[in-house]
Amino acid sequence: METMRAQRLQPGVGVGGRGTLRALRPGVTGAPTSAATPPAGPPPAPPPPAPPPPPLLLAGAPGLPLPPGATGSPAVLREAVEAVVRSFAKHTQGYGRAVNVVEALQEFWQMKQSRGADLKNGALVVYEMVPSNSPPYVCYVTLPGGSCFGSFQFCPTKAEARRSAAKIALMNSVFNEHPSRRITDEFIEKSVSEALASFNGNREEADNPNTGIGAFRFMLESNKGKSMLEFQELMTVFQLLHWNGSLKAMRERQCSRQEVLAHYSHRALDDDIRHQMALDWVSREQSVPGALSRELASTERELDEARLAGKELRFHKEKKDILMLAAGQLGNMHSSSC
């Protein structure tokens, strides 16, 4: 019984072979889904997904003490980030020292670990440069919990791109420590009310875990006491499952929303999930040529827009990585068939 339940909760969307393990994997093998091409007639409206979490930091989350104008122009964003970096350096390194923001970010997370933070993969901050032979250079930084940020300025050198990514990541890391960033009863009520207003929902939906907003409330309550960055890391898994069509497939396999939430609330985003989703996009591309390139172009635009706005990027970055993995698998298949 437990084995069958675990199989039904696999993140795949397979069509056909309903009782097989492959049909329950994260991908969407077989006929393409609406993400690849619209059906001939109007598609049935799927049950609403869980509303997204309250926006992080620079998107103006409720209760967050942002520097004045932090959500405004790029110039104001730069000024706000610099102010937070200087403030952090003043309190940790004293006056008169030049700020090495890359070292400061690493020091921040090592300090959190030394104070008892549960960092399952250690306190190492990881940087990734986008390959390029000319400016502007782009760098991404992944924090120990999985949150991702990127250089938000025009960077003429690779070193400057690294510093830019470190600055926005440090700002978010510091702000995430503020009490207003913790999920409390008051925060839950405010977030659910905002979700109801955004989705034109009613109060009964918020109390029903089988609705999207009810599931959102359930997730918030299950993560009470955690910070918003920690919650965003969890939500990334569900965002990817929704994007790939996996949540819809699980509903078709008679998985309850509570089962899905309980299962994936404790499962980290891993290479198995990425690989299975990539296989789905290989299948989509084979069924509808051009589907992969269109999705990749759209994802790259979204990633660049979010990066330049100083937003958390993991969802967009994971989407791009999955699509690039699919493109690589297609290339290997073409090479082997020649």
Curated annotation (Swiss-Prot):
This is LIX1-like protein. Pfam families: LIX1 (PF14954). CDD domains: DSRM_SF (cd00048). Residues 1-65 are annotated as: Disordered. Residues 29-38 have a biased composition (Low complexity). Residues 39-56 have a biased composition (Pro residues). SUPFAM superfamilies: dsRNA-binding domain-like. One of its GO terms (cellular component) is cytoplasm. It comes from the Eukaryota. Belongs to the LIX1 family.
